[in-house]
Amino acid sequence: MELENYKQPVVLREDNCRRRRRMKPRSAAASLSSMELIPIEFVLPTSQRKCKSPETALLHVAGHGNVEQMKAQVWLRALETSVAADFYHRLGPHHFLLLYQKKGQWYEIYDKYQVVQTLDCLRYWKATHRSPGQIHLVQRHPPSEESQAFQRQLTALIGYDVTDVSNVHDDELEFTRRGLVTPRMAEVASRDPKLYAMHPWVTSKPLPEYLWKKIANNCIFIVIHRSTTSQTIKVSPDDTPGAILQSFFTKMAKKKSLMDIPESQSEQDFVLRVCGRDEYLVGETPIKNFQWVRHCLKNGEEIHVVLDTPPDPALDEVRKEEWPLVDDCTGVTGYHEQLTIHGKDHESVFTVSLWDCDRKFRVKIRGIDIPVLPRNTDLTVFVEANIQHGQQVLCQRRTSPKPFTEEVLWNVWLEFSIKIKDLPKGALLNLQIYCGKAPALSSKASAESPSSESKGKVQLLYYVNLLLIDHRFLLRRGEYVLHMWQISGKGEDQGSFNADKLTSATNPDKENSMSISILLDNYCHPIALPKHQPTPDPEGDRVRAEMPNQLRKQLEAIIATDPLNPLTAEDKELLWHFRYESLKHPKAYPKLFSSVKWGQQEIVAKTYQLLARREVWDQSALDVGLTMQLLDCNFSDENVRAIAVQKLESLEDDDVLHYLLQLVQAVKFEPYHDSALARFLLKRGLRNKRIGHFLFWFLRSEIAQSRHYQQRFAVILEAYLRGCGTAMLHDFTQQVQVIEMLQKVTLDIKSLSAEKYDVSSQVISQLKQKLENLQNSQLPESFRVPYDPGLKAGALAIEKCKVMASKKKPLWLEFKCADPTALSNETIGIIFKHGDDLRQDMLILQILRIMESIWETESLDLCLLPYGCISTGDKIGMIEIVKDATTIAKIQQSTVGNTGAFKDEVLNHWLKEKSPTEEKFQAAVERFVYSCAGYCVATFVLGIGDRHNDNIMITETGNLFHIDFGHILGNYKSFLGINKERVPFVLTPDFLFVMGTSGKKTSPHFQKFQDICVKAYLALRHHTNLLIILFSMMLMTGMPQLTSKEDIEYIRDALTVGKNEEDAKKYFLDQIEVCRDKGWTVQFNWFLHLVLGIKQGEKHSA
């Protein structure tokens, strides 16, 4: 019987296996390439009788078989022929590993389902002309006690046990752990041990013009300290640290004893380290490109460094890898020609191509089981099943509604419109449980997409996803019982639903969660999605030649729109039809790949043909916003995401730090644990300790707060910790210990003072007692400050510690600096918070830093103060206390009490009091003008609401700054039913008074304020797309204030997208006038805040 490809499915279900065995191949010739026998010599773990050399077995292995069958074949041969047959009788095939050598490294053939002919070792042997190649059969041994102890240490640091597989339905977690060994080892082997130990924080961006102006006569003065003496030297901004050391030693040749330098030592034995910080000035970078040097120039501070011995690179030793490497071919299937069933003896088929499966995909919904029924028993329930790829729903079906009881059974097959062969990698089977009142649901709509009418009357209760193509490229089959996620009610957790609903993890709380039982078609053999073979696209040249001018203009207009502009069906059709033209414009890529119909295998093949011809993309300059767009939730295809990651490889370390928060969040949008993005983050973290430090905390915070992605973040963090080195592991252990101890203290203090705002003397006394107990027993002698790894905190200054008067009872803690080279006795102030999710504050502060870097390119210094803030766990975190700063509220109250909110001159008088000379006062006013302009523009563009006099602060040098970013993008609070935000930003009469103006009058300072605002505003408009994309990515990731596209629209409106520069300038100047007109309303709000004690934010929370 011969099959006709277009008439019936080639891959038949289990009940038709007998029929398949009777099928004959169409032709023997067609099957030769994938049916060949491959000679392999297997080296066995047992020795020959007469000598100690190991036994070997030469086998001819079927190329189309899989690794599991090959291992069984070797084991059977060993049973038959080995002199130690008893050994093989005791141990089954699963007790052995298959290893081969490549370029001096041992690799494990790890994936038992991999087709033999796709193994990397075969390609290697062919390239090196080895026949037969050798594979070693090695006995698998249990992990050593030392190894288990190390794993326990890692589990404590991660906050999750990656070896616990009780909540997984496949081996993807273990597969990823093994897969990440290779990039980890490669990065550790290639990094410079000396540079890694000292992790210099540098940038290659040009020095801004405003900083050049602070360098007189092209000279920078550096004070070099050694023991109790110091020496000031004059250097050029272009001198490298090495040249500076050489110059210094030449100058001090005859005075070494003065600086406590042994005569035998030279500049080669020393490095420059910043006084009081673990920050080194080393390498071949000009001194002007070190971030600390720029920080000092910007703030008018002297540059103090200590002459120090370099740290020992041996302290960064990485524990010897216990696992053999796995090659990049692991988990990869063959080409369709190798896997297809056509033309083959079906008795010999072991793995079948997905593209042979011509029938429609279907799923059997057996039923659901719920531990606790809803209170309202008069409800009906149905299951909606979607197949989606990214945000694209490929098809949708649903069951009929049934009465909502503890167990609801359907036992019904839902057949989808998509064929099995068209299922793309990364496609999710999304199952959702809806309920509603009986009349609202009509059984007539069974198995169809719910109408908008019926959808409006029902409520989504539970959901779960299953990846239809697993991490091995194999189609899922058989029975699954999936524990579902419940939809959060009102509250902060609701904001994370957009991201959570993409997870393929199941609910670990099996006892208390809804479960759904489903059945997928079972097959005689694994069904594998083939690798795509790049082939020319015959349509390409014809389409390129046919583009009329009118359509070209239309295409260019589509490409020019911003990321929020929705694409119509006609737009998508045009982009796809002229895809080769679109390919020439990197800005078109997100729109082009949004136009792909991912549920059609032929279209996907053509998309990969496009990706193979992306020379313009590869050669274009890096546009971070554009590249990050390809990493958002709209793109699930790993090849599309990989070209974005490849582009990010050129980011320098400082920029990786700028975007690290978003990149970590973007990992949630990956369909699989192992991805190009996960590997990029791993490599950059292992290359630079500063990046590694923040990667650790960003991942650990997500593991603690996001159950939906715990496993994914945990497996990446484990891979990082296995390669970061002993010194970093020690640092992280100390930090985690400190946080766990302080968390316990905070919980104890909160239990004593309940929900009150005031703090009794008894509570303060208890705090000091608990801190003393910690200090005397468990607290580490020193630890790196999580939000600033250059700082090491030492002993607590207990007399300065207190409980802050607010609902969540944060601790105000002060630590002594642990570094003996610190020049002052200033403490390190940290607010330890429990009960608030600081991730949104982190987002805003990070965007402020990006705004600063945008302004720097236009030589604007807006004196922003993005203080340190980091989430270290589930609603736990640390905030930096800014020195010599106080809230506007405190200044207003300190003079005339609550009515200070209406006294325009109070702030100006306070600044005068803090300025010892007129010159210092004028400098403070200047700084106030710039910082006020910076925060006016930033808070307006970001829609930062809930601004009151307790969350606006000022330093004694006039630097205004905002804190507590709980309300963004226009999500403003109301008071007594009235929206409190009546002005675009805060520019009150007392602020204007500092600038020398009032009412509608003007002044030189106010004129400068307006000019700065306009320049800063227009500079941000040039980066509208970047700001939109950064926020769009966070839209899906658990920010309670970011839940819809409308939220992001706020930024678009604020930046006046579509207006010309002149109109935009007028628009912002109009906003300033609105503030001048309505400044009294803000003063009135501030008065209410002082009188009624409206606690919207923590006092002094920065």
UniProtKB/Swiss-Prot annotation:
UniProt-listed Gene3D superfamilies: 3.10.20.770, C2 domain, Phosphatidylinositol 3-/4-kinase, catalytic domain, Phosphatidylinositol 3-kinase Catalytic Subunit, Chain A, domain 4, Phosphatidylinositol 3-kinase, accessory domain (PIK)
SUPFAM superfamilies: ARM repeat, C2 domain (Calcium/lipid-binding domain, CaLB), Protein kinase-like (PK-like), Ubiquitin-like
Biological processes per GO annotation: adaptive immune response; angiogenesis; cell migration; cellular response to cAMP; dendritic cell chemotaxis; endocytosis; G protein-coupled receptor signaling pathway; hepatocyte apoptotic process
Chemical reaction(s) catalysed: a 1,2-diacyl-sn-glycero-3-phospho-(1D-myo-inositol) + ATP = a 1,2-diacyl-sn-glycero-3-phospho-(1D-myo-inositol-3-phosphate) + ADP + H(+); a 1,2-diacyl-sn-glycero-3-phospho-(1D-myo-inositol-4,5-bisphosphate) + ATP = a 1,2-diacyl-sn-glycero-3-phospho-(1D-myo-inositol-3,4,5-trisphosphate) + ADP + H(+); a 1,2-diacyl-sn-glycero-3-phospho-(1D-myo-inositol 4-phosphate) + ATP = a 1,2-diacyl-sn-glycero-3-phospho-(1D-myo-inositol-3,4-bisphosphate) + ADP + H(+); L-seryl-[protein] + ATP = O-phospho-L-seryl-[protein] + ADP + H(+)
Tissue occurrence: Pancreas, skeletal muscle, liver and heart.
C2 PI3K-type domain ranges (all copies): 357-521
GO CC list: cytoplasm; cytosol; membrane; phosphatidylinositol 3-kinase complex, class IA; phosphatidylinositol 3-kinase complex, class IB; plasma membrane
Effect of R1021P: In IMD97; loss of phosphatidylinositol-3,4-bisphosphate 5-kinase activity
Broad class of where this protein is predominantly found: cytoplasm
This protein's pathway: Phospholipid metabolism; phosphatidylinositol phosphate biosynthesis
Keyword flag Transport: no
Domain named PI3K/PI4K catalytic: residues: 797-1080
Domain annotation PIK helical: ranges: 541-723
PTM-bearing positions, type Phosphothreonine: T1024
Family: Belongs to the PI3/PI4-kinase family.
PANTHER family: PHOSPHATIDYLINOSITOL 4,5-BISPHOSPHATE 3-KINASE CATALYTIC SUBUNIT GAMMA ISOFORM, PHOSPHATIDYLINOSITOL KINASE
Name under which the protein is recorded: Phosphatidylinositol 4,5-bisphosphate 3-kinase catalytic subunit gamma isoform
Gene: PIK3CG
